[in-house]
Amino acid sequence: ATYKVTLVTPSGTQTIDCPDDTYVLDAAEEAGLDLPYSCRAGSCSSCTGKVTAGTVDQEDQSFLDDDQIEAGFVLTCVAFPKGDVTIETHKEEDIV
């Protein structure tokens, strides 16, 4: 399945198509968006976003703690959409 992922970035909001087997960060790059990232392995906070609607699967992440996940934070480099989802990007400063 392919879902609509709405990315709320500092430079505006854009909605992209993201298959359920593609990481949000990869789909964003294919769509020409320039989102922050570093390790691409779910083990740092460079790509942190915050889910404001919908859900993602980020089982591969190893950086965020349970409280951060419950608050909606997501590592876009290892997040698969589980439906239509809205993510605010560039949220690394909010989790430190």
UniProtKB/Swiss-Prot annotation:
The molecule here is called: Ferredoxin-1
| Cofactor(s) recorded in Swiss-Prot or TrEMBL | [2Fe-2S] cluster
Q: Which Gene3D superfamilies match?
A: 3.10.20.30
Give the GO terms filed under biological process for this record: electron transport chain
Q: What is its main location?
A: plastid
Domain 2Fe-2S ferredoxin-type, first and last residues per copy: 3-93
Keywords, A to Z, come to: 2Fe-2S, Chloroplast, Electron transport, Iron, Iron-sulfur, Metal-binding, Plastid, Transport
Q: Name one GO molecular function term.
A: 2 iron, 2 sulfur cluster binding
Residues that bind [2Fe-2S] cluster, according to the entry?
Answer: C39, C44, C47, C77
